[in-house]
Amino acid sequence: MFKNILIVGCGLIGSSILRASIKKKISKKIYVLEKSKIHIKQIKKLRLNCEILKDPKKQITNVDMIIICTHLSEYLKIFKKIEKYINKNTIVTDVGSAKEKVSGEIKTKIKRNISWISSHPIAGSEVSGPEFGNEKLFSGKWCVLIKDKNVNKKHLKILTKFWTKIGSNIVYMSLKEHDHIFSITSHIPHLVAYNMVKTAMNFEKNKKSNIVKFSAGGLRDFTRTAASNEIMWK
């Protein structure tokens, strides 16, 4: 399907995309750009069939698709590092859970005409890191693709095929529709969970009482949600 794919950031989602792409033989060559020494060590230990780029200055030619799997605040920095890999045929996508602000910044601050089509696979876990990656993470799960009036239709079709091939069910949304839906179904529940667990822990500390120890199913569900990596929201 592809000759070269570059995955930027290889945590839970990035490593799951990597594993699924290897399993489905999506690309002849898969590159991973990762700055975490711990993650690099884990990827090597897992013996995943990819080339790790420790140095973003290394030249790669004919990159068909770049998938950004980092937290949102890193996007503009990443674009400066990967810009040399992008040509007119390169699809650039991401897996972030907030779209309108980030996409707006990319369009206004990145001067080059790039084929940017944002993705949001509705899959994940409270755990993080490449060792928790799962080639079946996206199987039967929704993946939202942002479809605006300027989208490259050929690239959208290719990106749809990619996500479908690794198991996702595709739905198309506008930036506004996406952010409206997931602010209610995902962001607010996480915010409530973080505050609920923090309140319980503070109360336990102040009262010197084992509150969390005796939590029933309700609070346990909150703790699972609150355990997810908060840096991905920044």
Segments and roles (model prediction):
Residues 78-131:
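Rossmann-like NAD(P)(H) cofactor-binding subdomain of soluble oxidoreductases
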Residues 135-228:
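Internal alpha-helical scaffold of NAD(P)-dependent oxidoreductase catalytic cores
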Residues 4, 28-29, 115, 142, ...:
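Residues at the starts of beta-strands that form the adenosine-phosphate
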Residues 31-33, 53, 93, 117, ...:
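Hydrophobic/aromatic beta-strand patches that form the interior of the parallel beta-sheet core
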Residues 1-58:
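NAD(P)+-binding Rossmann beta1-loop-alpha1 motif at the extreme N-terminus of oxidoreductases
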Residues 234:
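C-terminal active-site/capping subdomain that shapes the small-molecule cofactor and substrate pocket
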Residues 58-86, 90-91:
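Rossmann-like NAD(P)-binding element
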Residues 35-36, 70-71, 95:
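Short beta->alpha hinge that forms the Motif I/post-I loop of the SAM-binding pocket
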